[in-house]
A protein has these predicted regions:
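Helix-biased detector of long, well-ordered alpha-helical tracts
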Residues: 1-241
Length: 243
């Protein structure tokens, strides 16, 4: 915590951590808190430990050629919510306050546990949460881990209008923006899984396929480009350019 932090904020953080852990039946085993001048806002790091049955592990590297690639919810959720909170007043000079509040509220979608549970029941080959580096980074990581190529339709990648407009305002690439809340899934039955997720109230879309070889190709209205290795997340650029 930064210097001059009020004790009430620490109590609030502890309560939020307890509530979040209880919601997913996780125990908090310990922790450490300190005041330091090297941060200018609260910083929380978490190390999670879990276990899974050997035959129940679904990894990033399980995609096979021919599998459909699904993206759940929408990309850029976390990055959009963070920017909307941190740059609220600046955004309100260009957008309505209602729009900014809608963007801030996207953080309610950050858990991927609901879609993971549905995917496991449906039977899938690979799962990978989309975090730093955005959807482009996650696609590269899944392809690299699985030893497959990709053919992805950019237009099919689900994205919210709030993310599009905020990224345009700050000249950011939404496809390289931290996207916690979205998950990549490799499955032989893409349409059926999308339908199963929809029944649970979870938006999802088939965005492409895993293919033989190493080429990771993005198609956009007939144009073809090759996916590049993950770059620094656009959120960091936003923080550097607009503080």
């Amino acid at each position: 915590l930064p210097e001059h932090t009020e004790e009430s904020l620490l109590k609030q953080l502890m309560q939020e951590l307890e509530e979040a852990a209880a919601a997913v039946s996780v125990q908090i085993m310990g922790g450490h808190t300190e005041i330091t001048r090297v941060v200018n806002q609260p910083l929380v790091t978490v190390c999670g430990v879990g276990k899974v049955k050997k035959n129940g592990l679904i990894s990033t590297g399980g995609a096979k050629p021919g599998m459909d690639i699904i993206a759940t919810k929408w990309i850029g959720l976390e990055g959009t919510a963070i920017i909307a909170h941190e740059k609220e007043e600046e955004l309100c000079t260009h957008f309505s306050r209602h729009f900014v509040e809608q963007a801030q509220a996207l953080d309610r979608y950050l858990s991927v546990m609901p879609e993971a549970a549905t995917a496991v029941k449906s039977g899938v080959g690979a799962m990978h949460d989309v975090t730093e580096g955005g959807i482009f980074g996650a696609l590269w990581e899944m392809s690299e881990a699985s030893g497959v190529g990709l053919e992805i339709d950019l237009k099919k990648i689900p994205i919210r209008q709030e993310t599009i407009e905020i990224c345009e305002f700050f000249n950011l690439n939404p496809y390289q923006l931290i996207s916690s809340g979205s998950m990549l899934i490799g499955t032989d039955h893409g349409s059926q899984l999308v339908d199963a997720l929809a029944k649970e109230g979870i938006h999802a879309a088939v965005i492409g396929k895993a293919v033989e070889g190493n080429d990771r190709v993005i198609f956009n209205d007939g144009e073809k480009r090759f996916l590049e290795p993950p770059k620094a997340d656009e959120l960091y650029r936003a923080c550097l350019l607009y503080t």
